[in-house]
Structure formats: C-alpha cells, structure tokens
C-alpha cells in the first residue's frame, strides 16, 4: 500500500512500483527519488516520529534521520509477528501486528503485547 507523509517542508512517499522513497517540495506536483536501495526490504508504511522517519518494511522496523535518504534497522526480529501499521501514541510507539496490538517505549527497538 502506498504511503505518504508530511515531514518538515516536504512530502515523502513510498513509490510501490519501484520500492523507492520519493520526495516533493512543491505540494506533489513533481517527485524526486531520495532512496532506491532495497537492502531495507520492501517499504510498506511510513511514520514521522520526532526527528526520525520510521518505516515498516518486509524486513522489520527501519528508521531514517536524513528524510529517508538512508535507512537503519531498529527491529528485525520479534515475537510480535508481522508489523502492519505504526502510530505515534505520545510516550509510546504503537504497532498493529499479525498478533495484536503492541507498544514500544524505546522508539521501536523492543515490543510488548498490549492486553
């Protein structure tokens, strides 16, 4: 599913046809590729989170500190199941997974089941 977010003065999106991260500085009238690397897996969802962008990929949770130009793994092995969506819950990061609702208090490094 394509995902688009606003981050600073830019719009940032996943181009699912190419699995690229793209950005626009003119309200989406034109798009430029920012990241075309596939080492992070297939991008599925984006979330602005403080000064980072978090991404759900086919390999887990990844983060970027340079507007999506490069990605680092934050959580690639978890008993939480497959990540489906992320939400900024204020003091916690929330994730809907294939096994239910999970929360993290360390930017997605570890996950705990919410009952």
Placement of each model-derived feature along the sequence:
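Repeated scaffold domains used in trafficking and secretory/extracellular systems
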Residues: 1-8, 40-49, 80-90
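An edge-strand/N-cap motif at the start of beta-rich repeat modules
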Residues: 1-34, 112
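Hydrophobic beta-strand positions that form the internal "hydrophobic ladder"
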Residues: 11-13, 53, 93
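Residue-level marker for isolated small/hydroxyl-bearing positions within beta-strands
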Residues: 14-16, 56, 96
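Loop/turn residues immediately N-terminal
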Residues: 18-21, 59-62, 99-102
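Conserved Ser/Thr-centered positions that define the repeating blades of beta-propeller domains
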Residues: 24-25, 64-65, 104-105
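Short coil turn/linker residues within repeat-based beta-strand modules
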Residues: 28-29, 68-69, 108-109
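Surface loop/turn motifs at the tips and blade-to-blade linkers of beta-strand repeat domains
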Residues: 35-39, 75-78
């Amino acid at each position: 599913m394509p995902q688009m977010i606003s981050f600073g003065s830019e719009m940032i999106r996943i181009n699912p046809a190419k699995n690229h991260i793209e950005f626009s500085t003119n309200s989406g009238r034109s798009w430029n590729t920012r990241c075309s690397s596939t080492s992070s897996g297939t991008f599925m969802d984006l979330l602005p989170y403080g000064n980072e962008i978090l991404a759900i990929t086919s390999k887990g949770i990844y983060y970027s500190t340079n507007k999506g130009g490069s990605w680092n793994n934050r959580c690639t092995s978890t008993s939480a199941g497959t990540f489906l969506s992320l939400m900024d819950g204020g003091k916690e990061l929330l994730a809907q997974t294939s096994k239910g609702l999970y929360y993290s208090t360390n930017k997605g490094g570890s996950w705990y089941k919410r009952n």
